[in-house]
UniProtKB/Swiss-Prot annotation:
Identification of the protein by name: Heat shock 70 kDa protein 7, chloroplastic
Annotated GO MF terms: ATP binding; ATP-dependent protein folding chaperone; unfolded protein binding
Organism annotation: Arabidopsis thaliana
Chief site of localization: plastid
Effect of gene knockout: Defective in protein import into chloroplasts during early developmental stages.
Biased composition (Polar residues): 668-678
Amino acid sequence: MASSAAQIHILGGIGFPTSSSSSSTKNLDNKTNSIPRSVFFGNRTSPFTTPTSAFLRMGRRNNNASRYTVGPVRVVNEKVVGIDLGTTNSAVAAMEGGKPTIVTNAEGQRTTPSVVAYTKSKDRLVGQIAKRQAVVNPENTFFSVKRFIGRRMNEVAEESKQVSYRVIKDENGNVKLDCPAIGKQFAAEEISAQVLRKLVDDASRFLNDKVTKAVITVPAYFNDSQRTATKDAGRIAGLEVLRIINEPTAASLAYGFERKSNETILVFDLGGGTFDVSVLEVGDGVFEVLSTSGDTHLGGDDFDKRVVDWLASTFKKDEGIDLLKDKQALQRLTEAAEKAKIELSSLTQTNMSLPFITATADGPKHIETTLTRGKFEELCSDLLDRVRTPVENSLRDAKLSFKDIDEVILVGGSTRIPAVQDLVRKLTGKEPNVSVNPDEVVALGAAVQAGVLSGDVSDIVLLDVTPLSLGLETLGGVMTKIIPRNTTLPTSKSEVFSTAADGQTSVEINVLQGEREFVRDNKSIGSFRLDGIPPAPRGVPQIEVKFDIDANGILSVSASDKGTGKKQDITITGASTLPKDEVDTMVQEAERFAKEDKEKRDAIDTKNQADSVVYQTEKQLKELGEKIPGPVKEKVEAKLQELKEKIASGSTQEIKDTMAALNQEVMQIGQSLYNQPQPGGADSPPGGEASSSSDTSSSAKGGDNGGDVIDADFTDSN
C-alpha cells in the first residue's frame, strides 16, 4: 500500500476532455479547447519514474464572481474609518459630510509616524513622541515594522541589518523584535497593532464617536501571509477589519471619487518600504483594477540607506571607525539621511552636520559634509532602475501601452524625489497628476471604501485583483497554477484530481503563491492532508480541490473526496503568521494595556485637578484671611495638607476621596461667612439674618420688622 503522506504530481500525456465555463473577467484565459495536463496525487518519495497510465485532471469549474454584483457588507449607523498603515507614516480618514476627511491626531498632525518605543521606566510611546527619542533609545524604538509583518526570518535577513533594534527568530522561524527595556519579544503584528490603536483613539476623539471598525490598506504586492498578518494586527488593536484593500486601489478611489468621466489611470505608489503599480479603469462609480505589480523590498527606506552607507564609508575611510556598529550613531545617520533626502526634493544641495557622532582617544569626532542632488541620484541609481520593471509588467498584464494611459497618479512620500518624477515622465511620456496629496490619498481612498461598507457612500463598485498567482506543488517540484494573477476578486475555482498510486489512502496538498515555475522559487503559504480515501487503483478516486479568495484577498482551500464525501479545508494563514491562540493572547494583552493606559491617564488628570484645587484653596485662604472662623480654617488646612500628601504618594482613588472631602470643608467657608454676625448687628436675633451696616441700601434694613427673616439678594457695595 502506498505511503499515507502524498503530494500532487504532474505528467504529460493524453487525458480526459476538460469541461470549463469561461469567466466573465477578461484577465482569465481558461483555454477550454486545449488538452489538459495530466495531474494526479502520488507519493512524496515516489519510487516511480513515469507511470504508464495515470488519471488526468477530470474537470475544472470556474465560479468566478460576477463583475458587477459584488455585494458590500453593510454596517448600519456606525463610523467606519479608513487606515493607511504605512512603513514610515500612517494616516486615518473618515467620511464627513459626504467627503473623505483626514483625521488630525492628538498632536495636531495629519500623519502619524509608525514608530513605537518603550522607555527604561517601561512607558510605551507611540507616534511622533516615540520618533523624537529614537536617538537616545535606539534598541527599544521600533520603526519600519511593516517590512517584517507576515514574514519569516529567512526572508528579511537584509532588512534586519538596517534597523537599530534586534530582530530575532522564534522556534518556528518567525520574526520577533527584541525589547530589552521590558524584557519581551514582540511580533511585528503587536507593534503594528499599537500604531493602529493610537490612530483609532485619535479618530474616536476627532469624530466624537467610538470607532471599532476599519478598512486597512496594504501594498498591492503583499502576499497572503502579509495580508492575514495585517488583519491580525487590527484584531489585536481591538478592531473589526471589514476589508483589506490594496493601496493603489485606495488611491484610485480618492482620485476618482465624484469623477464621472471614464479614464484609464496608472497609480505609481512608492512609499517608505514598498513599491506598487496598478492600472485601473475608472468611471461612473466603477473602479476596475486591470493589473498590478510591485516590489515589497523597495521604498524610501532604501534611498535613506544609500545615504547612510555613503556617510559611514566616507567616515570609516577618513577616521577608521565603523559607525554602522554603533546603534546610536546609526540612528543619527538614518535621521540625517532622511532629512537630507527631503531637502533635496526642493534644493540642489544640502549640508549634513552631525557633531559628536563618536569619540576616540583624540577627542570627539564630527561629520560635516555637503550632499548634492546629483550625488544622491548617483547613489540611488540602481534603485531607480528597479522601478522600471513593475511599471512595464503592469502595462503588459493589462494589455495596454503607455499611450492608452490617461493619467498617472503619484502616491507615497518617496514620489516627491525629483529623480523619481523624471523617471515617471520618461517612462510614460506624461506629466504626473499632482492633484492629490501623496501622503494622504491612500487613507482618503480607504475612507471612501469604509463609506461604501457603512452605507454612507453608494453607487461605487470596486473590482480588485489578486496580485500573485496561486497553485499547487506537482511532480518534479513544479508549481501548477490554479488562479492566475490579476484575477478579479472575489473568486472561486475548483479542479478535480485523482491518485497516482494503487491503494493510496491519503493526499497532501501544498499551496503555493508566486509567479515562478518551480516550487523552490515560490512561497509556500500552507499545506494540509486529506485522509480516509478508500483504497482503490490509481486514477479511480476523484478528489476536488477548491480555491476561494474573498474580497480581502485571503485564501481558503478545501479538498473533498467525491466518493465518500469526506472533506478537509483550511483558511490559509501562512506559515509566518501567528497561531490563533497567540493572537487571542495578544488581544487580551492589548485590552489590558488599554486599561492600564486609561488608568494612567485618569491618574494624571486626577493629579492635575488636585493641584488646581490646592492652588485655588490656598488662594482663597490667603484672600479671606481673618474673616474665616478659626475652627473652619483649621479643618480646611488639615484637609489641604492631607491632599498634598496624597498627591505625593497616594493612589488615584485616595486623591479623589481627599479632594472631595476638601471641597466639602471649603464650602463651609462660604457658609460661615454669611452666618457670622456683621459689625453693628449685635441686636439681631440669634440664628437670624445679620442686618446690613448703616451705609448699605435702606431696602436691606430689616431690624424693625419684628424679627421676621426676609429673603433678599445681597449686593456687596464694596
